[in-house]
Amino acid sequence: MGFWIFMCAIVLLIPFLMISFGNLFSKSAPKEINSAFGYRTSMSMKNEDTWKFAHHYFGQIWRTLGWILAVPSVIPMFFVIGKGNDPVGNMGLIITFSQLIPLILPIFFTEKALRKHFDRNGNRIL
């Protein structure tokens, strides 16, 4: 049972990190454009405007997807209660790997939104 609780916590880690960082980024981007923390792509780092836009947009998507992922991520874990460490670990692994898609997919949507709202040089399209 202890391993099952541990795996449930691991399975919820990605959704709750998405919610937390989504809230943080949607409310405010890191103060300075940097290559260490934040949503960092060549387009988002063009200027202050693209930096703030990208963080707000990406943060909203991550927060929403994090909440959407939380419950469906835990439900399959109930099917392996008391089944032993191998089935519990395998289920946790499958869930965690499936969470990588919604973790990474918002990058493509954010880049598309940046290209829609800004030109190649980072100037806002009116």
Q: Predicted regions span which residues?
A:
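Long, highly hydrophobic alpha-helical transmembrane signal-anchor segments
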Residues: 1-14, 72-97
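N-proximal short alpha-helices
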Residues: 6, 17, 21-27, 40-44, ...
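Helical transmembrane-bundle signal
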Residues: 11-22, 66-76, 99-106, 110
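Membrane-water interface of transmembrane alpha-helices
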Residues: 20-38, 109-113
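Juxtamembrane inter-helical linkers in multi-pass membrane proteins
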Residues: 32-47, 121-126
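Membrane interfacial helix-start motif at the N-side
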Residues: 42-63
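Alpha-helical transmembrane segments and their immediate juxtamembrane interface regions
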Residues: 85-125
